[in-house]
């Protein structure tokens, strides 16, 4: 239907994906001409300095050569034209396969803008108001409590919500939800203890979140949170489609984003980048092979709007434009 193409307009987009890992000696390989090259325009003619772009390439290559990341890829797009494209390093440790223009990366929190746009398509269709209570779509949240400190034994003191979080608060990280990515408070610790982000599906995820108190009264503060994952569930409830299917129908397919999804099919596994862990003391970086990093169909857990997608540089450029 093409609707997102009219909405996603930016003056310029610089995209950077990095496969984190590698020691300083990781090989650099010259790539075959990029499919982007046919679309390229003069950098100077589009307001960018050739010298500046060359310096960008040096800086990106240094991130690999100095052992900070395993591989890196950058793409500069303006007004629908590819101005500059660069890769350096490898995507896979086993055979030292280089990063290429079609390498598939785990994009983690860059999933969030896609979820946000998907939710806004429903908003523009009149499916919800910013002042709607979240419980209109997630009734499981009606009885969530609010943490208000701890007692002498270290147990959380809980209070009633003074109001149910609104969609506006959910969409601005002011609803009060935790996340579990940091913080030693009982709320974020509960997210970790219950492996909330590792839930097998969105229904299980929502049930877990409903049992964990808010960090603060809705609207009273800001905290980077699991709110975008909740937004994915709201999209599912409003649309009547699985969240991933809604993304496919309303964003990926109209924009021609053929490599963006919550899993990597077998036919594309060779293009999938490793994810690496870096030893802070030695600098050594090794690929992680736990199942949660594999992103295989049927085994990737919930469709997480906040962190769960994979994509390519080209796909994300289409989205940004």
Residue ranges and their predicted role:
Residues 86, 132, 241:
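Short beta-to-alpha loop/turn elements within the nucleotide-binding domains of ABC transporters
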Residues 33-44:
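Acidic/histidine-rich, surface-exposed loop or edge segments in extracytoplasmic proteins
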Residues 45-107, 127-129, 143-150:
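Short, conserved catalytic-motif segment at the N-terminal edge
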Residues 2-12:
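Bacterial N-terminal signal peptides that target proteins for export
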Residues 92, 139, 143-321:
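Short, surface-exposed loop or secondary-structure junction motifs
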Residues 54-61, 74, 80, 105-138, ...:
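Active-site SXXK
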Residues 21-22:
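C-terminal motif of bacterial Sec signal peptides marking the signal peptidase cleavage site
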């Amino acid at each position: 239907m093409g609707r997102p193409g009219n909405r996603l307009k930016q003056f310029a987009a610089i995209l950077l994906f990095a496969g984190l890992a590698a020691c300083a000696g990781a090989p650099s390989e010259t790539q075959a001409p990029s499919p982007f090259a046919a679309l390229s325009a003069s950098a100077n003619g589009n307001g960018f300095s050739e010298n500046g772009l060359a310096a960008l390439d040096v800086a990106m290559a240094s991130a690999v050569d100095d052992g900070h990341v395993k591989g890196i890829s950058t793409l500069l797009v303006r007004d629908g034209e590819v101005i500059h494209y660069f890769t350096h390093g490898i995507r896979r440790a086993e055979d030292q396969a280089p990063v290429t223009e079609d390498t598939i990366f785990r994009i983690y929190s860059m999933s969030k803008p896609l979820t946000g746009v998907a939710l806004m398509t429903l908003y523009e269709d009149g499916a919800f108001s910013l002042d709607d209570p979240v419980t209109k779509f997630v009734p499981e949240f009606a009885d969530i409590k609010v943490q208000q400190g701890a007692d002498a034994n270290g147990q959380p003191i809980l209070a009633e919500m003074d109001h149910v979080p609104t969609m506006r608060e959910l969409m601005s990280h002011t609803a009060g939800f935790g996340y579990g990515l940091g913080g030693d408070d009982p709320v974020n610790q509960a997210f970790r203890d219950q492996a909330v982000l590792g839930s097998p599906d969105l229904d299980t995820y929502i049930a877990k979140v409903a049992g964990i108190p808010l960090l603060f009264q809705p609207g009273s503060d800001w905290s980077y949170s699991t709110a975008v994952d909740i937004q994915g569930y709201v999209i599912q409830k409003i649309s009547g489609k699985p969240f991933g299917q809604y993304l496919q129908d309303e964003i990926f397919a109209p924009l021609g984003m053929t490599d963006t999804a919550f899993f990597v099919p077998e036919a594309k596994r060779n293009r999938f980048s490793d994810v690496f862990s870096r030893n802070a003391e030695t600098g050594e970086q090794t690929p992680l092979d736990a199942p949660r990093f594999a992103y295989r169909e049927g085994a990737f857990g919930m469709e997480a709007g906040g962190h769960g997608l994979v994509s390519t540089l080209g796909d994300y450029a289409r989205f940004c434009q």
